[in-house]
Amino acid sequence: MKKIHLDPITILHPHPVLLVGTYGADGKPNLMNAAWGGICCSDPPCVAVSLREATLTYHNILHSQAFTVGVPSRKHVAAADYVGLVSGRDHDKFRDTGLTPLKSERVHAPLASELPFSLECRLFQHHKLGLHTIFIGEILGILADEDVLGLYGLPDIEKTQAILWGGMGNNHYFAVGEKLGQAFSVGKNLKKSLAGADPVVGGPRFPEGTWGKQKGPKSGVRSPKS
């Protein structure tokens, strides 16, 4: 297949859809759709979102030193898109979408109670990169619906029905597709064929329901040393 050189642009597939909850200086709860974001550190557990200074959420995070990151399900796709279309300076996004603001018990930030789960974060670091500033939040807790918990007692993507954004190359929202294989397992045969019987790194580490009760790294699975 012929390869084509393209100009640099912010494109990856896929992107998580992340709804960032904050309080303003006036105490008003706000919610926005952050296009750029994801997990950025295992210990301490951290998530990052990148925001423009023009957004209300940018200023709210600096004021409150906290934010939440909620993961919407497929039934929230219209609401998730809406909160990225209008500004909290002019709209009450919780009221407009019918989502219910719930104050986090761990940080000074709201979350949408209808979302399957939300990360509760204190502002850990922030760095201006250019047009965007990256806000790194230390995850102090997770508030989740009991019925979306799966292996290790954590939210399961098949149960949360989390949605994905196709990115700059395909500006649509998508549902999670078919399961292809278990991470840190499906490549075992290939590794054995290339390296003999060396121990395989990774795989399930905790029996179901025992997450957090074992000593060891805080991350859910061990990453290969690459």
Pin down the residues of each PLM region.
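Basic, polyanion-binding surface patches
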Residues: 1-218, 226
